[in-house]
Amino acid sequence: MQIVKSFVYRRYTLDEVKRKIVDVLQGASTGLSGIELADRTDINRMTITKYLDVLHAMGLVKKKKTGNVNVWFLETGIADIEFPINYVQVQQKLISAILAGEEELARRILLSVLNSDIDQVRVLTDVVLPAVNTVGELYSRGRLDKTERSFLLNLMMEIIDLVKFNVRVSEQKANAHTLAVAGSDDKVHVAKSAAVAFSALGWDSLYIGDVEDQIDPFFDIDLQRYISRMWGSKHGLMVVCIFSSGEGSLRFLSSTAKAMKGRLRGELRIAAIATPELQAAAEENSDHVAKDLLSLVQWAERQYSITK
């Protein structure tokens, strides 16, 4: 009698396969072939080969040709990242890579995290922005010169872009719109991070950039015209998020945005992140003043749940 074995091929997520491969390669200093990885992970060879190519393209694994066989290794900096994700550990590794000027390592660390089952907003609030703050603190203490500071801050903008282009939106929110604008150069990273965070949460999100040098007696008209063009035909909740360390630009931008209330089809809210010194100025024209990005996002999410 012939016995027929039936095989059920399960579908794996990238995160599942990546974890299995990382776990196995961590203990294989001399590397493993695709066949060995398939055996040790209990994933069929065709599937493991496909995912190894994906992880190689992402910069998480590397291969070395030995005869006719590809031997696979973990890329530098990936082997000792803990799963589930330890955000403090990743933050420290990212800061170390950035301060050492190791751009590729910094990107690999972020990519490894972003392609895991993680809270994408926390990657920004608990990993990326603390790294930006560290650069600022080191510069304030005289431990970085102007050129190095510029290089590192530019690298951090690229890191934020890396998060942006790897965002996975589980569900797009209906009638949820945000616009982030910076009123000073030192707030561009948190402003852009806000736009990326809202995008990750399913909002229709815009980032204008730093407009401090654009502010003049007629810029309010220019900004209001832009908001009308982008949101004029839309409905729902509209949140203008303002980030500035300058009292003048903070007042100007918040009052300009507030003047748009009643002129749009949706419900307009003004939010700002401000230090205690600027709290009073921020409160004049804002519906909410947050202490950090996470509290701002949480407030906006609550507003959306109320108005939708």
PLM region descriptions:
Residues I43-R45, T49-R168:
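Long amphipathic alpha-helical segments
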